Amino acid sequence: MSKEQSCVLKAWEVTVRKTQQAKKRANSIFGTVSVAPQTDDDATTTTEENDDETSTNRSSIGELYHAERILPNGDYYTGQWYDSFPHGHGKYLWTDGCMYIGDWYNGKTMGRGKFGWPSGATYEGEFKSGYMDGVGLYTGPSGDTYKGQWVMNLKHGHGIKRFANGDVYDGEWRRGLQEAQGKYQWRDGSYYMGEWKNATICGKGTFIWTDGNRYDGFWDDGFPRGNGTFKWADGSFYVGHWSNDPEEMNGTYYPSGDDGSPEWDPKDVFTNLSEYKICSGERVPVLPSQKKLSVWNSSKRVEKPRRMSVDGRVSVGVDRAFEKMNMWGTESGEGAADIDSTTRRDLDAEMMRLEAEGFIQSLRPSPAPMRLPRAGRKQGETISKGHRNYELMLNLQLGIRHAVGKQAPVVSLDLKHSAFDPKEKVWTRFPPEGTKYTPPHQSSEFKWKDYCPLVFRSLRKLFKVDPADYMLSICGNDALRELSSPGKSGSFFYLTNDDRYMIKTMKKSETKVLLRMLAAYYNHVRAFENTLVIRFYGLHCVKLTGPIQKKVRFVIMGNLFCSEYSIHRRFDLKGSSLGRTTDKPESEINSNTILKDLDLNFIFRLQKAWYQEFIRQVDKDCEFLEQERIMDYSLLVGIHFREASVAGELIPSGARTPIGEFEDESAPRLSRADVDQLLSDPTRWASIRLGGNMPARAERTMRRSDCEFQLVGEPTGEYYEVVMIFGIIDILQDYDISKKLEHAYKSIQYDPTSISAVDPRLYSRRFRDFIFKVFTEDN
């Protein structure tokens, strides 16, 4: 019997004897207690384990003690140890020469410590979950130093960087790059003080040379761009508009006296500035979070795999925890304890106390190991000749090629109100033989309509979409793919071959909603660079000629799951419970299956800086949708698990590295190295944004068996390193008469708060409440 089980039984025995002393029936209560027998594996420590483990204080599992261990791969650890992991203060030496001395928590570097590389580089400061995170000092092998704030191995916050060549930067950092306000001083004494963007001088700032000359004004990509003033040490100055393009340069010289205009060309400033380079600094060869611990698995138990439902319900709840402790006897009463209501209340109270103190959780069966879902096939059916929608696809591609190809580039993102007029549309006729403006084609004649073309052209520029790439994705030689089944609304979805864009057929009502809210949408996505709402790139209509005169409306959107990482799990989250579970058996669920609220078995933990930005942005996006009377939207979430064994089992964060006689050390496995490489490579940081390729931790949750519609399960303390992609989709449903009737009808049958069709204000509040429970700060 384990120590925890003994504690529970003793506590129960004390309570029962106290309440039943007058009746003297305490012994009968425990007459029916039976505890599952302990296996040989649980009770025995093998000789091999004793050979590999040397400890200065051999304590039982569950106690903190000092240990010195030479691990199977040659690594060495000395320090405090708890339940098969370094825990407390300790020193770990890797065989490649790396070393860590400092605080540990459950096998992860956590707290203060010092990490050393074989090159001589060191980091001394705060760690969190294996990452350099907090305040710390990094010293590179060539003498570079950075002292300041870190987030997940990246310089983030205020910090001072001293380069080996003598240059110094003192200012703000974001995701490893100079950002916002900062001062950069070169070794000759010249310095720039002002705004930065992505490690380049950009925005408003001042450059001062050692000879006393200075430039005050606006910058772009390291050079003056826009209005600015160049001042000489003698007091004369030049005011004007600056640019690398001589045709855009213009200004006026103001002498300090009557000297007149000097023999000076403003282009000399650009020539001079080109000599002042921004140092990129050194690149860390291997990050602390990439270092694995070769921790010996002392238990060597092989649990029988248990079937786990997609929502994580596996024998949970207090009743199931005590299935083998038959306190109340059999149903027939044979051997049952005669316990009155007073005793029951006392026992219930004791149970609640034990629950609060954590004893009950220790007896609950651990959930079955999680596995990578079965890989799904590439989504969609290729639309080739003979497909029922082949001509419709040709019409769409012809129209896009015509519409995008003829448009002039956008000069300004400031649009007139008339550009958003729903009547601002252009019809173009496409006969098979072609016209002066349209090419000949092999499809039947059709008409093409562009809605608010200038607005969507500006949106594409705002979202940094290259027109040529846009046309190539949709209209290239590769055909579109039609998803296997239409959506709940009856719309069809099409994917481009490169997965970058999704095309959806729309009802007339949805088109009206988008046109009505287009101005507000444009202003919102322009004001908030990190908005999570879906990106719209175009709105079009194909009108087929003939007796039917059928109209098909399309909206072109960004595909949220277009990523370099494979998506293992997908969730569509609304915050409601009615009908919010998958209708597929678990055997049919694969990586393409979109799961729902009641299928969710994780809480997602974001780093502090990202979490705060996430909270702000969700609030802003929901306020926008609420103002536009939009409801029934979802947060679409994709998860890429960074670590799994060769057998497909997910490896929790901080878990033991698979080694020993039961596993193949040379077997390939999915690693977090790719993501750590992304974090350490400055050229790839731009791909990380709010909702896009975000490193995070997913904590597994379990739902209680006595709670039918528990939206958010209870945390288990089991974490997984993940990359997350998420965004808000389905934002074209307003609270119209049909939704009001749906709400009234379903409210009679179900709990009104459990259904999706509710007033936009209530929907927004419920959505945020749910999302802020599912996403939390990683502290």
Swiss-Prot record:
Disordered as annotated region, ranges: 20-61
Lineage, uppermost ranks: Eukaryota, Viridiplantae, Streptophyta, Embryophyta, Tracheophyta
Keywords, sorted A to Z: ATP-binding, Kinase, Nucleotide-binding, Repeat, Transferase
Keyword Acetylation: no
Residue intervals of the PIPK domain: 382-775
One BP term from GO: establishment of tissue polarity
Catalytic activity as recorded in UniProt: a 1,2-diacyl-sn-glycero-3-phospho-(1D-myo-inositol 4-phosphate) + ATP = a 1,2-diacyl-sn-glycero-3-phospho-(1D-myo-inositol-4,5-bisphosphate) + ADP + H(+)
Gene name as annotated: PIP5K4
This protein's name: Phosphatidylinositol 4-phosphate 5-kinase 4
Organism listed in the record: Arabidopsis thaliana
